[in-house]
Amino acid sequence: MGLVGLHSGTIDMEFIGVEDHGDEEGKQIAVSVISSGKNADKTEDPDSLIFTGFGGTDMYHGQPCNQKLERLNIPLEAAFRKKSIVRVVRCMKDEKRTNGNIYIYDGTYMITNRWEEEGQNGFIVFKFKLVREPDQKPAFGIWKSIQNWRNGLSIRPGLILEDLSNGAENLKVCLVNEVDKENGPALFRYVTSLIHEVINNIPSMVDRCACGRRSCGSKHVFREKLSVSSSLVISAKKSGNVARFMNHSCSPNVFWQSIAREQNGLWCLYIGFFAMKHIPPLTELRYDYGKSRGGGKKMCLCRTKKCCGSFG
């Protein structure tokens, strides 16, 4: 976080100095906090959080006491009084690692309230309520939604099938429709790999020898133009996988690439999809269908700013 300038402090709060000649206690103001869920922080709400002040604990085997408006609590108090924007990073435990954490940047917040209350140890602690600024893309909210779906605490909106692959994939492929009332696709066979006819003729650049059949004659991994005499058509009408449901877009976020791969001494054709840019969680994957040799134009429904109105 320090490398990207998000949070450079070694503690759960970062502050900067400000010029305020009329307020001696306002020379430092909080600009970033990390809510780790410790110190009685309340972090379950995706649009707000309760941040506990600093001090008054026996973290270093000292005597517990009431928290005071001093040291690290002063920058938080200054941000509250001046209604200054504060960056918030949510810290969550990584379930895949014993001592690992996951940090989620959740945008900018504003401290809207500050009060004192009795803590779990019987001493007074400071509480700061931070509310997320409007018109920001969800971050921690998406994380919490996914957790609730996995744990069965809530149902994903528009969910039709929990696993379209019926266990064929390592990860479940959820079928979701948030656009219309269509209940699901027509009957088809879910496959995890492309069912194709083997390309019997090895490309001319590969020597026709045992060495060539082991792929050491050519070092090309991706091959856009294949030396194939007949046209190739990939149809997902009767069988396919998750790529079967990827829609067209005039502003795609993935692109397709043909791949020629040696398998058991023979060349086979595959299609791979690659990200064109950063894709946030729960974002629909779309690619440009391109131009077809026949069939005419079809109406485009991508509704992006660069929509051409038709494709094909």
UniProtKB/Swiss-Prot annotation:
The keyword Nucleus applies. Residues 163-219 form the Pre-SET domain. InterPro entries: H3K9_HMTase_SUVAR3-9 (IPR051357), PUA-like_sf (IPR015947), SET_dom (IPR001214), SET_dom_sf (IPR046341), SRA-YDG_sf (IPR036987), SRA_YDG (IPR003105). One of its GO terms (molecular function) is metal ion binding. Residues 1-132 form the YDG domain. It is found in: Nucleus; Chromosome, Centromere. Although both SET and pre-SET domains are present, the absence of the post-SET domain may alter the methyltransferase activity. Pfam families: SAD_SRA, SET. It comes from Arabidopsis thaliana (Mouse-ear cress). The keyword Mitochondrion does not apply. Zn(2+) binds at residues 250, 300, 302, 307. GO terms for cellular component: chromosome, centromeric region; nucleus. It comes from the Eukaryota. Residues 296-312 form the Post-SET domain. GO terms for biological process: chromatin organization. Belongs to the class V-like SAM-binding methyltransferase superfamily. Histone-lysine methyltransferase family. Suvar3-9 subfamily. PANTHER family: HISTONE-LYSINE N-METHYLTRANSFERASE SETMAR (PTHR45660:SF13). Keywords: Centromere, Chromatin regulator, Chromosome, Metal-binding, Nucleus, Zinc. Histone methyltransferase family member that may lack methyltransferase activity. May methylate 'Lys-9' of histone H3. H3 'Lys-9' methylation represents a specific tag for epigenetic transcriptional repression (Potential). This is Putative inactive histone-lysine N-methyltransferase family member SUVH10. Residues 126-290 form the SET domain.
